[in-house]
């Protein structure tokens, strides 16, 4: 019988840092919730609590609307680091 993998417990980094508000202009903080193709990563992968996940989603959508974060990334750009310019 195969052994079960032991995973480390995921924690919400925003709760631990006692963040009250997530600003859409802070792209350095928002990039941790984005995949390499700038898609919003789900809670089960990031470990973010429901309250902060909703705040992150709203902030990312606002940043996209103001053109601080792109909506999509070309395949060619994924080979390079898309977060290099942030």
UniProtKB/Swiss-Prot annotation:
Keyword list (alphabetical) reads: Ribonucleoprotein, Ribosomal protein, RNA-binding, rRNA-binding
Its quaternary organisation is: Part of the 30S ribosomal subunit. Forms a tight heterodimer with protein bS6.
Per the UniProt entry, what species is this protein from, by scientific name?
Answer: Campylobacter jejuni subsp. jejuni serotype O:2 (strain ATCC 700819 / NCTC 11168)
Q: Tell me the Pfam families matching this sequence.
A: Ribosomal_S18
Note the InterPro entries from the entry: Ribosomal_bS18, Ribosomal_bS18_sf
Q: Which domain of life is it from?
A: Bacteria
Q: Could you give one GO CC term from the UniProt record?
A: cytosolic small ribosomal subunit
Protein name listed in UniProt: Small ribosomal subunit protein bS18
Q: Which gene encodes it?
A: rpsR
Concerning PANTHER family, the annotation shows:
30S RIBOSOMAL PROTEIN S18, SMALL RIBOSOMAL SUBUNIT PROTEIN BS18M
GO molecular function, a single term: structural constituent of ribosome
Q: What is this protein for, i.e. what is its function?
A: Binds as a heterodimer with protein bS6 to the central domain of the 16S rRNA, where it helps stabilize the platform of the 30S subunit.
Concerning its family, UniProt says:
Belongs to the bacterial ribosomal protein bS18 family.
User: Which NCBIfam families did the record assign?
Assistant: S18
BP-aspect Gene Ontology terms: translation
């Amino acid at each position: 019988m195969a052994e079960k993998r032991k995973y480390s417990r995921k924690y919400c980094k925003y709760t631990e840092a006692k963040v009250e508000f997530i600003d859409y202009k802070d792209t350095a903080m928002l990039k941790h919730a984005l995949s390499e193709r700038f898609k919003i990563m789900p809670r089960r992968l990031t470990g973010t609590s429901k309250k902060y996940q909703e705040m992150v989603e709203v902030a990312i959508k606002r940043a996209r609307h103001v053109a601080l974060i792109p909506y999509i990334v070309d395949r060619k750009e994924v080979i390079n680091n898309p977060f290099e310019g942030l």
